[in-house]
Amino acid sequence: MSAQSVEEDSILIIPTPDEEEKILRVKLEEDPDGEEGSSIPWNHLPDPEIFRQRFRQFGYQDSPGPREAVSQLRELCRLWLRPETHTKEQILELVVLEQFVAILPKELQTWVRDHHPENGEEAVTVLEDLESELDDPGQPVSLRRRKREVLVEDMVSQEEAQGLPSSELDAVENQLKWASWELHSLRHCDDDGRTENGALAPKQELPSAVESHEVPGTLNMGVPQIFKYGETCFPKGRFERKRNPSRKKQHICDECGKHFSQGSALILHQRIHSGEKPYGCVECGKAFSRSSILVQHQRVHTGEKPYKCLECGKAFSQNSGLINHQRIHTGEKPYECVQCGKSYSQSSNLFRHXXXHNAXKLLNVVKV
């Protein structure tokens, strides 16, 4: 198994020992009714995502011989795609969905996987909904604040979101703005990674909240040099999606006039205006706007930590926690101080560092 495949799959769910036992022992010797060779009931199997990951990570050394290897791969693939319950079209969609998520920028991979889409169309809706939420800087402050709360609930865990300073919440939103901006930028690039006149189209201007040369202490998210200050588009080959001119956005929000191609995206968007949070936690009563956020929140009560580091085995309740942890192993430091160039693996460390710069400035002012 290559290092690249490990990195790509490392943010996915890693099965617990109990789940691994279910994966390897997919046939019961005897079911409760005494029938030998009975399969595990489909509604009692773990998440198909677990089997998809095991199928992709399976190594030849994991089996005693070639025949056993093929047999185990076949069984893992069956448990992932579930031909007994899925149609051919549904199986095709699962394979397409896997590849689509794999070609997304890493930030968007996490975002899409956290929303658990069941097919490619649902994944596209998740991305279009994100773009629409981040795409209108002229909205009222109260509405933008509500949007930010929804985004933060999606990006960080419940325990992480509580008590975060405003600057940290801004950083979470900015990460998504970079990814959303990349979608717009690549949409207008030619084969050389530039627009026709070599400049960014109006839609692709740097989001003001993340222009590192305007906001002291803001994050440098590791954007390639050619992409700084709105000079050019991203190089070709990372993520391209062309607009389908025949596909009209027929769903319109009565509150703000935004258009959506999917009714489900409009429903999610309207909750920003209404403040509706239909998904309530039975343990503590806290409500959320999306079911995926409720699933993440419930891990606070259950203690479930499905995201496991392949390097050291440490487990986390959220993808975002695992991604931050993995930087300890990779040495990646994407958060850069624009004042002195020092880099950090965690955004919180950068904010503490930036505070030291600000304190030094205050001392100089007092001395003067």
Swiss-Prot record:
Pfam families assigned to the protein according to its UniProt record, in alphabetical order: SCAN (PF02023), zf-C2H2 (PF00096)
PTM characteristics: Sumoylated.
GO cellular component, one term: nucleus
Cross-linked residues, Glycyl lysine isopeptide (Lys-Gly) (interchain with G-Cter in SUMO1): K27
SMART domains documented for this protein: SCAN, ZnF_C2H2
Listed SUPFAM superfamilies: beta-beta-alpha zinc fingers, Retrovirus capsid dimerization domain-like
UniProt cross-link Glycyl lysine isopeptide (Lys-Gly) (interchain with G-Cter in SUMO2), position: K22, K27, K147, K177, K236, K277, K286, K361, K367
Domain SCAN box: 52-134
Residues modified as Phosphotyrosine: Y335
Record-linked InterPro entries: SCAN-C2H2_zinc_finger (IPR050916), SCAN_dom (IPR003309), SCAN_sf (IPR038269), Znf_C2H2_sf (IPR036236), Znf_C2H2_type (IPR013087)
Top-level taxon: Eukaryota
GO terms of biological process kind: myelination
Renumbered residue ranges of the record's region Necessary and sufficient for nuclear localization: 251-301
One GO MF term: zinc ion binding
Keywords attached to this entry: DNA-binding, Isopeptide bond, Metal-binding, Nucleus, Phosphoprotein, Repeat, Repressor, Transcription, Transcription regulation, Ubl conjugation, Zinc, Zinc-finger
Cellular localization per UniProt: Nucleus
Segments forming C2H2-type zinc fingers: 251-273, 279-301, 307-329, 335-357
Modified-residue entries (Phosphoserine), positions: S132, S142, S274, S292
Family to which the UniProt record says this protein belongs: Belongs to the krueppel C2H2-type zinc-finger protein family.
PANTHER family: PROTEIN ZBED8-RELATED, SCAN DOMAIN-CONTAINING PROTEIN 3
Record protein name field: Zinc finger protein 24
Species: Pan paniscus (Pygmy chimpanzee)
